[in-house]
């Protein structure tokens, strides 16, 4: 009985109510978390936030990966701890803490391996390791060391998920604060043309004054120092938002009534999928940090300042892009006073790739999470932590720096990156509303399925569809709250081209939106391999709740303004 009390009771010798109580608590907690994640995902699908739902799925994949690692490590820990190597391979230079911190002398460590294991292993693990390894040999990784590693990986994954969620939450709150500016811009676009031009020119002048009036702005070296200081004053101003918005709409030939703010929100949701999750380069970075974290280097202390340096570097670059655009507008105003506006292009960014800044932000968030995870691990997973906690100044500076940088990056740098990276040469796929994209995918999918059952001939060069075949495509919903159904009916092989025929014959900026749809359709057609010719009109009929009948050729006469072209629907979205 005394030997049993020292080593602990087995499951067979434990009362059943104790085992049942532990299982009940574990099942209840896991079920509660699983239901919460399920409800949140269901709400995202209901509100048609497909990008955020995809990000949630990626977070679930990360948690599943951590669970798999924990399962494998827990099941193989006993086997790994039985791998014995010579004690001479354990050089104290590669210890996290020095021997003095543990209070262990080198002679005792080398000559009395069993006693050393007894000071660092649980009693049950020591008993097995000492008999298996023998004199002069010891486990490659002890059982307790594997348990501590398991705790660290678990804390790292949970901390990274929480930091990613906090970053996106703060960034979204900042971006949503710009909605009032977007509403003003749309009202200006719908108001008198002369008044609109006057206000736009005023905003452009204010934008140039804020970013190009300082004497350092004309010096190619001092402007970097100026941009470095400007990033501390906060996010963008109203004049900056108006100028960048106008440049984006003009660059991509979009109507001035286009909702640029909703486009940024959709873009942010898409980019969230890239921020969430620990990619394999980040895992490699974490492994390297664990490997080189030897005593005397204070590696974790020095790398804790890497996020602060990168945040300032990214913020300076974003401010430099805005300042360069303002200087170009200023030069245009001195030359030709009419038509001065920003000119977005990829050449403004490093290596012509705006996405590099997003990757740096992803690394910043991971490094901050890694810093906090190591601190929690030291408190929770290591009993003898004298070498980790003896310098309170270093610990405090690491924690304060990590928290401040995380808040600064989330609330300032990420929103600024979202709007400034739109100044590249290409637009994101979010330029078209998600409901329209889903409907276009549904349309192309049905075209492909129908073509298999009709007398159609499809090839890489040509594609024809039977004129007598009528294809009804899925619902086009302009909002999740609408109860009416918008359907597309194609009555002949030449009924689809009028969307783009009207765009080709018009020079209005609004028709540029149709070209975006045409690009999207072309990419989708290339993916499915069947390209129906676009020659005639596509008619959209809106069926209300009271209309339960079929659709005929005389629906325009019966419903008045119910019929509309797909081009008009694209413009409204």
Curated annotation (Swiss-Prot):
The chain crosses the membrane at residues 14-34, 63-83, 152-172, 272-292, 294-314, 360-380, 400-420. This is MLO-like protein 4. Its main location: membrane. Residues 35-62, 173-271, 315-359, 421-573 are cytoplasmic. Keywords: Calmodulin-binding, Membrane, Pathogenesis-related protein, Plant defense, Transmembrane, Transmembrane helix. The C-terminus contains a calmodulin-binding domain, which binds calmodulin in a calcium-dependent fashion. It comes from the Eukaryota. Residues 434-455 are annotated as: Calmodulin-binding. It is found in: Membrane. GO terms for molecular function: calmodulin binding. It comes from Arabidopsis thaliana (Mouse-ear cress). Residues 1-13, 84-151, 293, 381-399 are extracellular.
